[in-house]
Every structure is written in structure tokens, then in C-alpha cells.
Amino acid sequence: MGARWNGWTAGALALALAWPLSSRAQIAETSIQPVPEANWSATAGRTVGAGSSMLQAEAGWPGISFTYLKGLDERSDVGFHIGLNYGFEGTTNRVTGINLAIPYRRNLVSGDTDIAFQMQPGISIYDNDGVLFGIGGPVGVVAGFHLSPPLTLDVGVDIPVLLSFSNPAGFMFGPQFGGGAEYLIDRNLAVTARVRVGPQFGFTSAGSSSQTGFVTLIGLAYNAR
């Protein structure tokens, strides 16, 4: 009888010790959530998604900007952009101005590598010892490489174009090359960074010129889907 009682006691004790261990293992197993798939992007090759709306704020050079994008379908989005600049069109010239544009992006290739065409036509107004008014915007292509579900690296080329009607009147353009990155914090929030650099050419009523233009921006994007 004593041996049987000791056996029951040992079994009950083993069960009591094993239960919290299995419970903790189950809790640990169920509490680890998989990283969400990066099925949208703010500045790389993917769009924001059909019916989704994205808000993005960026700061750096040549200024501070706010962008709204709406997914028209799985491959294209369009929106509105406002830039408050303290640098002239990505050059080292310190001129204050504002840029209002309508960004458009079209995904051309999708998969582990995404390629998109993008443009941002609009108007620019600068205080350049008088009012400089112009129309134009960057046109370019970007390719995004998905290294992991939350991380995307990209390379791209943009050609900023500005047709100025006053102070001075003329035409400015130049190819800019560079790269960037996006990191998805959760399924709706991403941190972005991008850099572009290249020659900038100007043919205006004040004469012709060339200099180095660059863009360096860090941002935060939220997809309200």
C-alpha cells in the first residue's frame, strides 16, 4: 500500500511540474508572431496596394515634404505632394520655396525584385531675389530588392526637370542616381531612406551653368489599409 501511495505521489508531483513547463512552452510558441509580409512600399518598386491610402513625411535635403498616395489598383497609385524647400531643386543653392505636385507610380515588374516607373509633375515657386515660378518635376525608375519580409533595398535613377518662366526664365535638368531602403516596423508602418546624386544643368536667361545636385531624405510612412 505504501509503495502504491508513493507511486501515485510521485506521478502527481511529476504532472504538477510538467504542466507549467508545457504551458510556458505553449505561451512562448503562440506569442511569437511572424514578421508581416512587405506587400507595399512608400518609395521602392511596389505600390501602396489597391484601395489603400498612404501618408508619408520626409526630412533632409532639400527640404521637408508630405506625400499622400492612393492605390488605384495593385499596380498603380496617385496622390498629392507638398514640399517645403530650403534648397533649390536639390542643388547646394540655399533658396526657400514650395513645390506642389501630383505623384504617380506604376509597377512594371513584381516579385522578389520590383521595378516601377514614377513621376511627380507639379509647380515650384521660389524666392530667388524675386519670384521664380516653374513647372516640372522628377521622372524616373526605381527597382526594389526584398532581402527579407520587412527589409527592402532599392536603386533608382531620377531626372528632375524644371521649366522656369521668371527670375530667371529657362530650363533645368539633370540625371540623379542612388539608392535607398525601407524597413517595415509592422504591417502598416515603415521607415524610409533614400539618396540621389548627379549633375544638374541649367540653360536660362542668366546664362548656362552646371553643378552637383543631390537628395538625402529620411521618412516615416503609414499605410491606412
Residue ranges of each PLM-predicted region?
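Bacterial N-terminal signal peptides that target proteins for export
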Residues: 2-11
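Bacterial N-terminal signal peptides
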Residues: 10-20
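Short, surface-exposed coil-to-beta transition loops
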Residues: 63-65, 98-99, 137-138, 176
